[in-house]
Amino acid sequence: MTNALRTAGLDAVYLEGGISGWKDAGLPTRKKIGAVGDRWVTREHPKIDRIACPWLISRFISPLAEFIYVPANEVLAVAEEKRATPYDIKGAEFGHVGDRCSFDAIIRIFEIQDSALDHLATIVRGADTSRPDLTPQCEGLLAISYGLSANHPDDHEMLKHGLIIYDALYKWCRLQAEKHRSASKTAA
């Protein structure tokens, strides 16, 4: 699998101990979902959730996933035609529910447990649902997302650059979680 991922251009390393080693290290795992494939479709002209979700899917669910952006009125037809999973559209399983965004839905449905990812989800939710009061980083993500959109009118080009932004933001969230755990141990 490592070689297949490297061949696909992904920076993959072999984890000694496989999934057991992953779990023993306390790293997040996910629930297997039957009908979800490696092809996902959503509305064109992504900003926040429609870039955050592909990042989440490619980093935690399916590293070889393909993402398709189409006009909103074509999402369901393309999903059926291409056997793709629709996301971030009204009524989709992987869509907004209440005050939660599609990013939250994916985390919930796949049962991904990771404190850094929970922090990132709050940032994404605040930026995507116009609630910058959730955490100070929401406004920054919103600004970066609109800047990326203005710089990259091609959706896949924006996605390529957006993945780098989300990698960095997730790393920052992990560092914050580690700092919090260290402070808790010191206080104990």
For every predicted segment, state its role:
Residues 109-188:
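A charged, amphipathic interaction segment
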Residues 1-47, 54, 81, 88-91, ...:
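Rhodanese-like catalytic fold shared by cysteine-dependent sulfurtransferases
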Residues 38-133:
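Polyanion-binding interface signature
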Residues 3, 54, 58, 62, ...:
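A broad, structural surface signal
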